[in-house]
């Protein structure tokens, strides 16, 4: 719904959630599950501020109460080294789930429509600021009317205009095609998480990514970890090479495409913007720095916020622990300096680490003992050198990339 109230009229509720992406809708869904919290979600109207359809992925034992939004899932993952050798791992009891943003939005909007005290406002959030007893969100609808929303707490998932100061910033940037082949070319039981059989850039690393949906349909992506994104033409050329010469798909058609950029950074993302204003999602640090994954952390964070509010507290827990962030900072710096070989590093992790332990590590839920054992299987010398120098490096402010996170606030 869109508001038609005048600019001075305030609409009051318990919580306002700014942004209708993965983070905003997940939080609204968790908050309204019991019906005792009045929630208003502010979503941008149709236009340039509304993101295109995206793909989000995460692993879990089951799809929880989001099963209706899951398009496909896999319990076997594969990584291809630069030498062409494949490593296939069984992830049971975990499964790798794929969610399309339109399916997720439809599911949550349906549930919000049934929840007492929940509503969705189609408007642009122009300003968010603290007031006595809470916070206000000043909005403007597409047809001109303005609305002031007042709440005890505001959770803002909008992208930051600039990234917080960081020592290292790489971009995970990609373009993907949803393809349909003339003949059966895919194994729907196995997802290719990283395929390093693509030409490697001079700086950083590149890999292919395949999520098979049927024997003749899949999402195939070309991804780089590097300092700068590519032109659309360059992604198209790389995808054409990957589909034609690496995957050997034969004749195929491209039914849809998606493209994104995710910051991979050791910046510290503040989760509080004021006494009653909190940041969630990527803006609140929910994107894992070394992988770009966001969706699982968003679900954990949303559940924790909802539980705290029902107990009378307003908190946004850290999406990842200090150990995970410290390890990510070392890895990002080692990749950026070229001290470690990216394809060799990730291929080695999958080759030498039990899959359940590795997935817990990638999701930030591993134990110190598991992390120690994984660390011993990495290039110890370059990683130690990087760990020693990190505390002495300055943090610099950089502009935020123009497209949101992969399978998190945008794909992956």
Residue ranges, per PLM feature:
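N-terminal FAD cofactor-binding segment of flavoenzymes
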Residues: 26, 30-84, 103
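FAD-binding beta-loop-beta segment adjacent to the flavin cofactor pocket
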Residues: 199-205, 260-279, 334-354
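Predominantly flavin-linked oxidoreductase catalytic cores and closely associated redox partners
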Residues: 30, 111-252, 265-268
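Short FAD-binding loop at a beta-strand-to-alpha-helix junction that anchors the flavin cofactor
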Residues: 210, 215-216, 272-290
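Short hydrophobic core segments
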Residues: 16-18, 42, 147-160, 277-278, ...
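Flavin-binding catalytic cores
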Residues: 228-258, 275-278, 300-321
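C-terminal helical "tail/cap" subdomain of flavin- and related membrane-associated enzymes
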Residues: 303-412
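N-terminal Rossmann-like FAD-binding beta1-loop-alpha1 element of flavoenzymes
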Residues: 5-41
């Amino acid at each position: 719904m869109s508001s038609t109230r005048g600019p001075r009229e305030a609409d009051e509720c318990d919580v306002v959630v700014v942004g209708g992406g993965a983070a905003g809708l997940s939080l609204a869904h968790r908050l309204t599950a019991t019906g005792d919290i009045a929630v208003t979600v502010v979503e941008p109207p149709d236009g340039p501020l509304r993101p295109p359809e995206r793909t989000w992925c995460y692993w879990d034992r089951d799809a929880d109460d989001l099963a209706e939004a899951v398009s496909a899932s896999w319990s076997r993952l594969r990584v291809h080294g630069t030498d062409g050798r494949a490593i296939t791992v069984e992830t049971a009891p975990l499964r790798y789930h794929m969610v399309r943003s339109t399916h997720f939005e439809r599911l949550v909007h349906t549930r919000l429509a049934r929840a007492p005290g929940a509503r969705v406002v189609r408007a642009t959030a122009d300003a968010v600021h603290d007031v006595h007893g809470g916070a206000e969100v000043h909005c403007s609808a597409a047809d001109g009317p303005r609305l002031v929303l007042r709440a005890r707490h505001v959770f803002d998932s909008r992208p930051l205009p600039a990234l917080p100061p960081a020592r290292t910033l790489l971009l995970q940037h990609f373009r993907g095609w949803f393809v349909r082949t003339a003949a059966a070319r895919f194994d729907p039981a196995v997802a290719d998480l990283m395929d390093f059989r693509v030409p490697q850039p001079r700086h950083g690393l590149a890999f292919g990514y395949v999520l098979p949906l049927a024997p003749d349909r899949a999402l195939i992506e070309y991804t780089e970890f590097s300092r700068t994104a590519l032109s659309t033409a360059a992604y198209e050329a790389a995808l054409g090479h990957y589909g034609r010469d690496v995957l050997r798909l034969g004749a195929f058609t491209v039914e849809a495409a998606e493209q994104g950029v995710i910051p991979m950074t050791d910046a510290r993302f503040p989760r509080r913007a004021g006494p009653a204003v909190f940041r969630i999602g990527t803006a609140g640090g929910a994107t894992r720095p070394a992988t770009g994954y966001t969706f699982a952390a968003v679900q954990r964070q949303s559940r924790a916020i909802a539980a705290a509010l029902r107990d009378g507290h307003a908190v946004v827990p850290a999406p990842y622990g200090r150990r995970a962030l410290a390890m990510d900072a070392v890895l990002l710096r080692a990749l950026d300096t070229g001290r470690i070989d990216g394809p060799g590093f990730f291929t080695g992790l999958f080759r030498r680490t039990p899959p359940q332990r590795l997935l817990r590590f990638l999701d930030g839920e591993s134990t110190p003992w598991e992390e120690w054992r994984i660390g011993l299987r990495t290039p110890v010398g370059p990683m130690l050198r990087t760990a020693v120098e990190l505390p002495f490096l300055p943090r610099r402010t950089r502009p935020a990339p123009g497209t949101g996170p992969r399978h998190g606030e945008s794909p992956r």
